């Protein structure tokens, strides 16, 4: 598979990144299934109707770090919350912070308003401002009255630190890269691993990055879908678990050459009609899925979760002074909790399973998780289905 910056869009001097995905497999393809609920068609956040994902990968240069020039191992990932009018029909939203070492732009307004009025973007720590500015410009291009005759737009941007592999002083994610990710956002299968915002990320001392998964409830429980997308850059090797198996302890002798404490951003989507309080409760269950993979939210980790419901959209302008919006009973919400925890756990492991080895600045290397050893261990513990 050939990946280019912007996946062949908006790539100025960036060179193609040749990667062989033939040896990488998602967790279910290895015979390991998390929980009892079935995934959606794509086992991705895009199984929630209307949700789209776009990536831009910025990957160029090699060798020693030249500050401000490269090598670049970074990118941007965007999530479109629905396929309609994202400005005028806000999705109900909430957030939860497990450990706040870092930041996520826009969370204050999400907590205050209970909604999201545009895309969600993920990128590297130093470029939250750059990506936010690009998102504002993109939204203005779609809605020219923003900030003039209409309200101003508050972008939502999450970050993780990719400086162990990336020239973090180079600010390599440009406006055209953000625009390309936004314009190229699509439904269907989602690229995972070292792609987009996940290009320079490491997780449990293996190559990490973008991962996704979904769960579909039974018709008796409403038939709703929960989808999760993560950018994982967290954890120590010995903490790592897959379906309860202490994989990290068994693989400690295969340490990667780069170790740096990092973070994780988790995005939870559902089509169940939830109010903001209920979405926040889903976000808290995503933290349980994170914990199942071994994370204890280390002091130096920033663990940020944002969630939204496409099934309860809030009109920006309405002639009605009282709105009647659908809302799921709390008595029916427990299956969504299980779906969220399971999908989060699997999304994180999918990121590890799908990521290739990446050599970054100064030869720093983040090594791909050895899938043959993982399968061997999971079979030993009786966790494989085949």
Model-identified regions with their sequence ranges:
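Sec-dependent N-terminal signal peptides of Gram-negative exported proteins
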Residues: 1-11
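Alpha/propeptide regions of enzymes that mature by internal proteolysis
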Residues: 11-386
């Amino acid at each position: 598979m050939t990946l280019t910056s912007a996946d062949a869009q908006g790539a100025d001097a960036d060179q193609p990144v040749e990667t062989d995905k033939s040896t990488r497999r998602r967790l279910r393809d290895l015979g390991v299934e998390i929980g009892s609920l079935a995934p959606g068609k794509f086992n991705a956040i895009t199984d929630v109707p209307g949700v789209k994902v776009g990536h831009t990968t910025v990957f160029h240069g090699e060798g020693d770090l030249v500050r401000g020039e490269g090598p670049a191992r970074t990118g941007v990932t965007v999530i479109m919350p629905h396929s309609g009018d994202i400005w005028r029909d806000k999705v109900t939203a909430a957030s939860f912070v497990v450990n706040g070492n870092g930041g996520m732009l826009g969370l204050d307004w999400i907590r205050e308003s209970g909604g999201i009025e545009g895309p969600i973007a993920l990128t590297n720590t130093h470029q939250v401002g750059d990506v936010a500015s690009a998102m504002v410009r993109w939204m203005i291009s779609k809605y020219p009255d923003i900030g003039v005759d209409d309200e101003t737009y508050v972008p939502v941007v999450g970050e993780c630190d990719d400086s162990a592999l990336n020239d973090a002083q180079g600010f390599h994610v440009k406006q055209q890269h953000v625009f390309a990710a936004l314009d190229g956002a699509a439904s269907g299968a989602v690229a995972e691993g070292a792609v987009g915002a996940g290009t320079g990320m490491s997780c449990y001392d293996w190559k990490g990055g973008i991962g996704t998964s979904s769960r579909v409830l039974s018709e008796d429980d409403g038939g709703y879908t929960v989808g999760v997308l993560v950018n994982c850059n967290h954890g120590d090797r010995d903490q790592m678990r897959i379906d309860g198996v202490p994989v990290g302890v068994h693989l400690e002798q295969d340490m990667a050459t780069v170790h740096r404490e990092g973070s994780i951003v988790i995005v939870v989507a559902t089509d169940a009609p939830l109010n903001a309080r209920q979405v926040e409760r889903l976000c808290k269950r995503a933290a349980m899925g994170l914990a199942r993979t071994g994370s204890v939210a280390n002091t130096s980790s920033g663990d940020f979760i944002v969630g939204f419901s496409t099934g309860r959209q809030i009109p920006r302008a309405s002639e009605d002074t009282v709105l009647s919006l659908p809302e799921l009973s709390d008595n029916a919400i427990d299956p969504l909790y299980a779906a969220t925890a399971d999908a989060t756990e699997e999304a994180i492991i999918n990121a590890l399973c799908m990521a290739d080895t990446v050599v970054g600045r100064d030869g720093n290397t983040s090594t791909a998780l050895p899938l043959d050893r993982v399968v061997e261990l999971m079979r030993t513990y009786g966790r494989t289905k085949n």
